[in-house]
């Protein structure tokens, strides 16, 4: 499955628009990790537990988008976007794009 943030795919022609695909995941933060992250934010640096949670969320959302696009008969998703909303103890990641059928552009062979 091709997934791209652009509206076009290099070397491919979009032959059919199948429709919008969306997916979201809401995760709660672990209280112990939240405390450690709070301490880390005081001294600076990457909050690795949050980074891991976000990467896991993104992977799950992408897998769901692919499943939904495949059910529509698509072989690509264009215009892919992600939005993150962080609450006090939760975060929600939403992914959406347009499921399409894309075919390779046939080049004419020189004579």
Curated annotation (Swiss-Prot):
Signal peptide: none
Record-linked InterPro entries: UPF0145_dom_sf, UPF0145_YbjQ-like
Cysteines joined through disulfide linkages: none
Cross-referenced PANTHER family: UPF0145 PROTEIN SCO3412 (PTHR34068:SF2), UPF0145 PROTEIN YBJQ (PTHR34068)
Assigned protein family: Belongs to the UPF0145 family.
Name of protein: UPF0145 protein RBAM_010660
Source organism of the structure: Bacillus velezensis (strain DSM 23117 / BGSC 10A6 / LMG 26770 / FZB42)
